[in-house]
Amino acid sequence: NAQVLNIVLTEDTEVLNEVVVTALGIKKEAKSLSYNVQQVSNDEITRIADANFVNNLNGKVAGVTINSSSAGVGGSSRVVMRGTKSLNGNNNALYVVDGIPMSDMSAASTQPTDSYEGAGQSGDPISGLNPEDIESISVLSGPSAAALYGSAAANGVVMITTKKGREGRTSVSISNNTTFSAPLVLPEFQNTYGQTEVGSYYSWGSKLNTPSSYDPKDFFQTGVNVTNAASLSTGTDKNQTYLSLGTTNANGIIHNNDYERYNVTVRNVAKMLKDKLTLDLSFMLSSVKEQNMTSQGLYYNPLVPLYLFPAGDDFSKVQAYQRYDSERNLLTQYWPYSTSLALQNPYWITEHIKIPNHKNRYMATASAKYDFADWINVTARAKMDR
């Protein structure tokens, strides 16, 4: 009494015929390439908003490590493929936007040489892009994939393909993404023994009658990141237009660590001369304001005095971080501890040493492709980036 069941599985053509963007900016099936290309879609990039969208690649690409800086919200990130290749040089991958390498105008990150050096690391240039404008990201690793860009691509290539107008339809998209952040893991501190002497940072003194209630976690706040985006896409078989606006307003977990980004993007693609000539023009504006990026070193870093605050002492008294000096007729910092470690009141740092930074970036690109035949074409690209 056996019964035969015929089961037919539907092909998942999206997986079987996966299309990726190659080093030349040409779309090909992944299985036809002789080198490794991994692609990340826009949905994966924007699912959880980050002030720097590069951080959203973490865990999505095999063999790639995303090193986020500790500067705070909006800080720069490095994309390291298949391990560190240089101890002192730049291990970051090359970014290519719509077939054109992106110049890196960020300052090099170096370790401070003494206690009084150090500054918060600003966001890298790629972080100024609006993630909602990205169609997909292809990660190219290995010498074959990056050969087109020479030695600049020795550490790999991150190919970014931006959106353009859709043929035959008009669509409007509006989105909002709000995320919250808080410290996940903090160092553990003893609260049994007090200061060795008055004004000292060392907590190797006598046993406290009442365990210290000091908790560095009270210094931090809940971070908020609000991202808004609106876009318009329209087009015909001869002309496609894309327009987008984006805003990112974020507050870090340290007071006054603020980040604001405003983006405007316009792109137009047109076909001429019996569809043999394709012109692609785009303009991107990114305006970024940031402040109070956590510094390296000691003197400008609020975390070091926070963690070295002596157990058993009253932390609330340093929250009133300034006192009036009648002799100098001005407000001065209140920090009743030794200056041997070049530390300052953490509240004084966050309130008075904000180090604001304002960056405007303009990127205009133009490309022209002429098809001589079905099997041969010539493409020219130009870019202004300032």
Residue map of PLM features:
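Surface-exposed loop/interface segments of Gram-negative outer-membrane beta-barrel transport/assembly proteins
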Residues: V15, K31, N91-N92, V97, ...
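Short, polar/charged loop or turn motifs at beta-strand boundaries
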Residues: N36-G59, T65-A71, V79-S86, D98, ...
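Short acidic/polar hinge/loop motifs at secondary-structure boundaries
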Residues: I100-S141
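Short, acidic, small-residue-rich periplasmic hinge/interaction motif at the N-terminus
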Residues: A2-T46, V54
